[in-house]
């Protein structure tokens, strides 16, 4: 039994590398099954967000190199390039890392709550793929419990900040009066929902939600009194959009330099503020070269995020302690499980010996033997049989000079100093 947590994140890899290592939702089930088959991992799950791609694996004898090689091959990267950005945590460290991630302690935005939902989705997909078994399943449940305790017992979730909040905060710095601004939101997922909520609360004049399916866009738009359109309507909507924030799961850019140039001409070069939260990127980087466009990527949000996180630093210390306790408790309980099979076999052996001696005693009673003599013989016979195998092994270990094993036996049988009975003089 061993755990591995392996991957890249916003601290170790650029957005260019992260978008190349990201998994689409459609890829996950097949990738998990392929991972387990080709690397002989016993259990596996994949967490892939705009800021990280991580593999969680339970195995018996598996090196991190084989997993890295699979990941590099799957995404058509060189192993050297991936290794330069990757990190690996094993066993206790892997458990602690998962709990830190789920609690928001390893996020770009410290304490952001969305990561827990993303972790739960990773678990659900792994179950669908059939790559989660009892051990990784227990680890996920312990991870969710630890994250919940962090939320409940610390102030890590107060003063809400997120990538979405950071994007809106940046928009506030550029537009002094958001109530006169119009916003175009591309996508309809969790991050865009948060962006829409923040903009709505700030009283933005008009919000448009563009999505691949009109149905999903309409559901989100209805929640905030916005307008729903298809992705094909984006060029027309750009003309009236002061703020553009995009976060989809598209593998190709949705917004190109040409479309933005055309919109700027019709806007008479009135500036457009854009934030591309997606990985891979939704907006072509060349758009940022235009004079009247302020284009920011996820990586550009670091400074804004840092300013909004000062109030959470104290809470993070308490959260780290809770995570450490949770990780230690999980590993302790997991190691206890390793003794279950041995204890079960020992109990079965003891019960067999008991039944043999009990049957012998019952026969003696049926033949008219004295009840007290039968009980004494039953107790003596059971004691001798239970001690026979351990006694033989202890003598053998002593003859071999195995002092360590003898000390362990003394601890196993709770034989402290002075515990040996002495015959009365």
Curated annotation (Swiss-Prot):
Quaternary structure and partners: Homodimer.
NCBIfam families: hemA
Lineage top rank: taxon: Bacteria
CDD domains: NAD_bind_Glutamyl_tRNA_reduct
EC number: 1.2.1.70
Comment block on domains: Possesses an unusual extended V-shaped dimeric structure with each monomer consisting of three distinct domains arranged along a curved 'spinal' alpha-helix. The N-terminal catalytic domain specifically recognizes the glutamate moiety of the substrate. The second domain is the NADPH-binding domain, and the third C-terminal domain is responsible for dimerization.
Keyword NADP: yes
Catalysis: reaction(s): (S)-4-amino-5-oxopentanoate + tRNA(Glu) + NADP(+) = L-glutamyl-tRNA(Glu) + NADPH + H(+)
Any one GO molecular function term: glutamyl-tRNA reductase activity
Other observations noted: During catalysis, the active site Cys acts as a nucleophile attacking the alpha-carbonyl group of tRNA-bound glutamate with the formation of a thioester intermediate between enzyme and glutamate, and the concomitant release of tRNA(Glu). The thioester intermediate is finally reduced by direct hydride transfer from NADPH, to form the product GSA.
The family this protein is said to belong to: Belongs to the glutamyl-tRNA reductase family.
Name of this protein: Glutamyl-tRNA reductase
The entry's keywords: NADP, Oxidoreductase, Porphyrin biosynthesis
UniProt cross-references to InterPro entries, sorted A to Z: 4pyrrol_synth_GluRdtase, 4pyrrol_synth_GluRdtase_dimer, 4pyrrol_synth_GluRdtase_N, GluRdtase_CS, GluRdtase_dimer_dom_sf, GluRdtase_N_sf, NAD(P)-bd_dom_sf, Shikm_DH/Glu-tRNA_Rdtase
UniProt site (Important for activity): 97
Binding sites annotated in the UniProt record for NADP(+): 187-192
Function recorded in the entry: Catalyzes the NADPH-dependent reduction of glutamyl-tRNA(Glu) to glutamate 1-semialdehyde (GSA).
HAMAP family documented for this protein: Glu_tRNA_reductase (MF_00087)
Annotated catalytic residues: 50 (nucleophile)
Biological source species: Pseudomonas syringae pv. tomato (strain ATCC BAA-871 / DC3000)
Pathway(s) annotated for this protein in UniProt: Porphyrin-containing compound metabolism; protoporphyrin-IX biosynthesis; 5-aminolevulinate from L-glutamyl-tRNA(Glu): step 1/2
Biological process (GO), any one: protoporphyrinogen IX biosynthetic process from glutamate
Positions of substrate binding: 49-52, 107, 112-114, 118
């Amino acid at each position: 039994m061993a755990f591995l947590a392996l991957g890249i994140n916003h601290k170790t890899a650029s957005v260019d590398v992260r978008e190349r290592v990201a998994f689409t939702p459609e890829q996950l089930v097949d990738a998990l099954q392929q991972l387990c088959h080709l690397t002989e991992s016993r259990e596996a799950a994949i967490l892939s967000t705009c800021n990280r791609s991580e593999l969680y694996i339970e195995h018996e004898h598996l090196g991190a190199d084989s997993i890295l090689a699979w990941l590099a091959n799957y995404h058509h990267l060189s192993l050297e390039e991936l290794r330069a950005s990757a990190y690996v945590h094993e066993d206790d460290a892997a458990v602690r890392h998962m709990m830190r991630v789920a609690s928001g302690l390893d996020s770009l935005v410290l304490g952001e709550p969305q990561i827990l939902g993303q972790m739960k989705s990773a678990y659900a997909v792994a179950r669908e793929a059939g790559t989660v078994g009892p051990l990784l399943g227990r680890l996920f449940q312990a991870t969710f419990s630890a994250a919940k305790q962090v939320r409940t017992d610390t102030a890590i979730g107060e003063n809400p900040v997120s990538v979405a909040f950071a994007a809106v905060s940046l928009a506030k710095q550029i537009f002094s009066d958001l109530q006169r601004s119009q916003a175009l939101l591309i996508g309809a997922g969790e991050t865009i929902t948060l962006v829409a909520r923040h903009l709505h609360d700030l009283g933005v004049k008009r919000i448009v939600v563009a999505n691949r399916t009109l149905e999903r866009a309409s559901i989100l738009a209805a929640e905030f009194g916005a307008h729903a359109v298809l992705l094909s309507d984006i060029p027309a909507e750009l003309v009236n959009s002061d703020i553009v924030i995009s976060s989809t799961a598209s593998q190709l850019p949705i917004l190109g330099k040409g479309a933005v140039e055309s919109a700027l001409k019709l806007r008479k070069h009135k500036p457009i503020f854009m934030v591309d939260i997606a990985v891979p990127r939704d907006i072509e980087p060349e758009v940022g070269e235009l004079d009247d466009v302020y284009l920011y990527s996820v990586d550009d949000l670091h400074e804004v995020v840092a300013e909004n996180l000062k109030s959470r630093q104290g809470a993070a210390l308490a959260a780290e302690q809770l995570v450490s306790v949770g990780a230690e408790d999980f590993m302790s309980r997991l190691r206890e499980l390793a003794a279950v099979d041995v204890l079960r076999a020992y109990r079965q052996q003891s019960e067999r010996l008991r039944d043999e001696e009990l049957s012998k005693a019952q026969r003696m009673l049926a033949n008219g033997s004295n009840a007290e003599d039968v009980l004494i013989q039953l107790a003596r016979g059971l004691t001798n049989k239970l001690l026979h195998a351990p006694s033989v092994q202890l003598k053998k270990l002593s003859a071999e000079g195995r002092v360590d094993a003898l000390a362990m036996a003394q601890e196993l049988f709770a034989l402290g100093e002075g515990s040996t009975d002495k015959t009365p003089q």
